[in-house]
Design a protein with these regions (language model features):
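Alpha-helical transmembrane segments and their helix-start/interface "positive-inside/aromatic belt" motifs
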Residues: 1, 9-23, 94-112, 116, ...
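Binding/recognition "hotspot" determinant
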Residues: 1-72
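Non-cytosolic segments of integral membrane proteins
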Residues: 24, 107-203, 237, 241-286
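Internal transmembrane helix-loop-helix hairpins in multi-pass membrane proteins, together
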Residues: 33-65, 85, 89, 109, ...
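Hydrophobic, aromatic-rich alpha-helical transmembrane segments
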Residues: 60-64, 95-99, 103, 165, ...
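Juxtamembrane "helix exit" motif at the C-terminal ends of alpha-helical transmembrane segments
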Residues: 70, 74-86, 237-252
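Hydrophobic transmembrane alpha-helix segments characteristic of membrane transport
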Residues: 72-108, 203-217
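Alpha-helical transmembrane segments
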Residues: 208-225, 252-254, 283-287
Length: 289
């Protein structure tokens, strides 16, 4: 009877060890895939991310928002001219330099507004260049090679009792579930950020029409800061995932397998929190409201 029980126990241990190793191997592989996937998603320009949505947004901006921006530009320029005349004692104290300055500012605004789309895309091209360079370094430095540690981990598991192995199996399954939750979190952040970019760029001509005005110019300046914040939010996301992947490397050298699994769980929750904070942090850095 003891012989039969030993065989069943040995079979269950082998089954649990194989399942635990499979879960942990998939866990490490998922980290590597997520780093590469985030680099592709957040590092893409609006045009490269989805050409169909990009074309629709540009068409709406050129045909609906741009005429409104032209009206706003004319209104802002007229109000500035009236204010300048009033401030100069109804032109009694006005010199040609002031008038030339107004003409120059208005001409600059007339040039900027029709080329708003090119200016906006240039901002994201700069951000994409930065993210591409950073993601290359991140993927190279945080790729976790499970082949180098799997033998030692199997030896540790083989020394454990059946009950402890079952507990580890449950824990590894739970941590694997959190990785799926993390994937959903990353999906929401990356796709939500791109949709926000499309929404912001669709109305770009309106704030850009106010850039040349002294009083209304804050609207355009804050809009540009918001664009840079959205662009460089991708860089912060890359850094968050890179830090996470480096921290997860500790599971390969942790003596206590259970502690390693729960540490990985804690890092996953921390990553979700920091990813959601990247938007407010980027806006704070660029002082965008």
């Amino acid at each position: 009877m003891n012989f039969l029980w030993d065989k069943v126990t040995e079979w269950l241990k082998e089954l649990l060890i194989g399942s635990i190793m499979s879960n942990l191997t998939g866990l490490f592989d998922n980290v590597n895939r997520q780093v590469a996937g985030i680099a592709d998603n957040v590092g893409a320009t609006p045009q490269a991310w989805n050409g169909g949505v990009f074309g629709m947004i540009r068409n709406l901006s050129d045909n609906v928002i741009l005429p409104i921006a032209g009206v706003i530009l004319a209104l802002v320029a007229t109000l500035e001219l009236i204010q300048m005349i009033v401030d100069r004692n109804n032109m009694h104290d006005m010199d040609t330099f002031m008038l030339a300055k107004w003409v120059f500012k208005t001409a600059c605004a007339v040039v900027i507004v029709p080329n708003t789309w090119n200016i906006v895309m240039a901002v994201f091209d700069v951000a994409q260049s930065v993210v591409s360079r950073a993601s290359g370094l991140v993927i190279a430095d945080t790729d976790i090679r499970i082949d180098s540690v799997i033998v030692g981990l199997e030896a540790k598991l083989a020394e454990m009792e059946l009950g402890a192995l079952f507990g580890l199996w449950v824990q590894s399954m739970f941590v694997g579930f959190t990785m799926w939750a993390l994937a959903i979190c990353i999906f929401i952040i990356t796709y939500g950020r791109m949709i926000e970019i499309y929404l912001v760029t669709s109305v770009a001509p309106i704030p850009m029409a106010t850039m040349a005005n002294r009083e209304w110019g804050q609207m355009g300046q804050n809009y540009l800061r918001s664009l840079f914040a959205l662009g460089f939010q991708a860089f912060l996301i890359i850094i968050c995932v890179a830090i996470y992947a480096v921290l997860v490397r500790g599971i390969a050298v942790e003596n206590d397998v259970s502690t390693a699994i729960w540490t990985c769980m804690g890092y996953t929750v921390l990553l979700c929190f920091t990813l959601f904070k990247t938007s407010s942090l980027a806006r704070s850095v660029f002082h965008a409201h």
